[in-house]
Amino acid sequence: MVIVLIAARYKKLLEWINNRNYEGIKAIYKIKNVGPKVFLYIDTSLDLKNIIKTFKKSISEQGGMAYVYEFYGIYNEKIDYNAYISNKTKDTMRYYQTKIKDLTDKELHDFLLKTQ
């Protein structure tokens, strides 16, 4: 599963995320970063909501309560800032239909081939 961490101080947050083992998460890989946006591949059986909850708890426990950050999923190769909106509605929104993508299926496929 791909999630996106957006934070100015993402290196410290990634350090905190990666220094623990999590039940249900086999591995965490960094695909790429674009400015403060870090695209992560999570090898897991957990859903997006539980991954985010787990990571936020871990960051909070390690002193990250003062950090400003957010996690997002991906929809139609774009960062899904509107997770609360139905997929049917998203399919009508210009943002999700633009040709400029945040993480293409090809980029993800190429990354997964490299990790195997």
What is each PLM-predicted segment?
Residues 1-2:
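Extreme N-terminal starter segment of soluble prokaryotic enzymes
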Residues 5-26:
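Short amphipathic alpha-helix segments
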Residues 21-25, 62-67:
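Short secondary-structure junctions
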Residues 27-63:
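Short, intrinsically disordered low-complexity segments
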Residues 33-38, 68-86:
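Short proline/glycine- and acidic-rich turn/helix-capping motifs at secondary-structure junctions
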Residues 77-100, 111:
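Short, low-order "capping/linker" segments at domain edges
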Residues 102-116:
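Short, low-complexity S/T/E/D/G/P-rich linear segments that nucleate or cap local secondary structure
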